[in-house]
Amino acid sequence: MQSFSDMAEDGGERFSSLRFAGLNSQNSPQAECEPLKNLGFRLQYLEEQGQPDISVIDSQVHLWSMRPELIQLLIDAHASFNLLPRTLFLAVNILDRYCSKQTVYEQYYKLAGLSALLISSKLVDPPDHTPHMQDLLKFCQCDYDRSILIKMERHILKILDWSMRNATVYDFVQLMTCDGGS
């Protein structure tokens, strides 16, 4: 099996965007592979740009103890709303990048996670699959209201300078599972 680097150098132009064709209980994930020059460079650049600064998150000790519960909530919401796999990976990345650029107080950590999931869903999922804010808030049984969720969503976008594109683990897995370009 070729490594990612070998594929990018030898035939990276075979791949351009990795779109998820669909996933449900009857279908397996399918990747569509399209031409692109310098795929390795592009994915590496996106990955580097999308890495959170863990040392900043480490300084917010309370986040690590709350993280397992929040990640489980995001996984449950992701499954409940039948969102695409990439949505969850991107949501966690958005949350981590936000927490590495902004001090997040305990009472707002869950709100930041839900907002990250909502942002991610708007970017990745078809418009008719994006959860409505009220449904998301009802699902998590939160004390937040729609207006605070909107404010957090805007704040995350502002702090991250509207930079939502990045390469996730899911993108690399999709690349590795692409049919050899035939």
Predicted regions and their residues:
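Acidic, Ser/Thr/Pro-rich regulatory low-complexity segments at or just upstream of the first helical elements
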Residues: 1-114, 118-175
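Short, intrinsically disordered, charge-balanced linker/junction segments flanking boundaries
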Residues: 177-182
